[in-house]
Amino acid sequence: MNAYTSDMDFHGGSKLSKITYPLKTIYNSEARKKIRLVLDDFKPDVCHINNFNYQLTPSIILEIQKWRKEGNPCQIVFTAHDYQLVCPNHMCKNPNTGENCEKCLGGHFLNCTKGKCIHGSTAKSFIGTMEANFWKLNGAYKYIDTMICCSEFLKTKMDTNPLFAKKTIAMHNFVDEVEWKDAKKKDYVLYFGRFSKEKGIDTLLKVCKELSDVQFIFAGAGPLENEINGIPNIKNVGFQTGDSLETLIREARFSIYPSEWYENCPFSVMESQMYGTPVLGAKIGGIPELIIEGQTGELFESGNEEELKNKIDKLWSNKSLAEKYSANCKENKFDNVETYVNKLMKIYRGEN
């Protein structure tokens, strides 16, 4: 990123930078000039861009288009990892109310300012509104040839913009292949991920307290860590990676993904099944696309405490069912890097 634009400190910085940053997050002339140097030097057939808002800004798209018009054929491909192009706070969730929100969909970006949706700040939210409206009116996004969405759910939200609907395709992220092992399951249910409200931790903790006979292991970190500690049937092992995390996943009866926001393509849901552990996932965002309900796991209504409790009890009490789901995980195939690259190459060649 710093190869194309100066480092931007959004939380500190000088008095001058606090004045210039808001403008630079909307249109970055420095990034535009530097991307031109790369284009002239490298002469790409494809420019594949990812998270460009606020630092590189869509100004780079204008420069790529200008370069194309000068006789340089080049596809512009964009991978959407979040809702940034249709929601200025990129999550479709109001951080003040905690509610999922679609008010900005369709280009109604003033709702971001009304809801103080960026860091709870009217000023920052207004800048986000300005940025979204500027590029809506400028029309830079029309120069993107293909928009890759990492879930069907994300695609439906992007498609609320008629311009995007002509360009979007859904393609889940890839995962590294792992060796299948018939691990010996142990008597615990696993949650691994961030300990935060949008991840559904509040709801899960209430259920854990009611299911005192079920042993839970939580692996992760986050702002709600203190609320986890002290619940007798929860063992908090902290943030885990590598072999230790793999072992925790493989040996769990099942894992839980109780998210309460519009997750796109959560790696944890795929990772759990890759290691032979079924998933009890919230029916929200792209999560249902990754679980074969009734085969590699179960789904429950996001935020529904009673349904989550019943589903946990069902899978905990019926050990043979959980074992059946575990065996089925072997058949739930996700794209590996080779498959993903082959799909990308078809897009690059314009065969999608």
Positions of predicted regions on the chain:
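Short acidic/histidine- and often glycine-rich active-site loop of Leloir-type glycosyltransferases
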Residues: 227, 270, 284-294, 298-299
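Conserved donor-binding/catalytic core segment of Leloir-type glycosyltransferases
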Residues: 148, 175, 181-199, 205-209, ...
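Acidic donor-binding loop of glycosyltransferase active sites
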Residues: 250-264, 277
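Short glycine-rich donor-binding/catalytic loop of glycosyltransferases
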Residues: 260, 277, 281-288, 302-303
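A short acidic/histidine/glycine-rich donor-binding loop in glycosyltransferase catalytic cores
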Residues: 234, 294-301, 314-315
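A short, well-ordered alpha-helix in the C-terminal region of glycosyltransferases
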Residues: 296, 307, 314, 321-335, ...
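Donor nucleotide-sugar binding/catalytic pocket of nucleotide-sugar-dependent glycosyltransferases
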Residues: 85, 102-180
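Nucleotide-activated donor-binding/catalytic signature segment of Leloir-type glycosyltransferases, i.e.
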Residues: 226-247
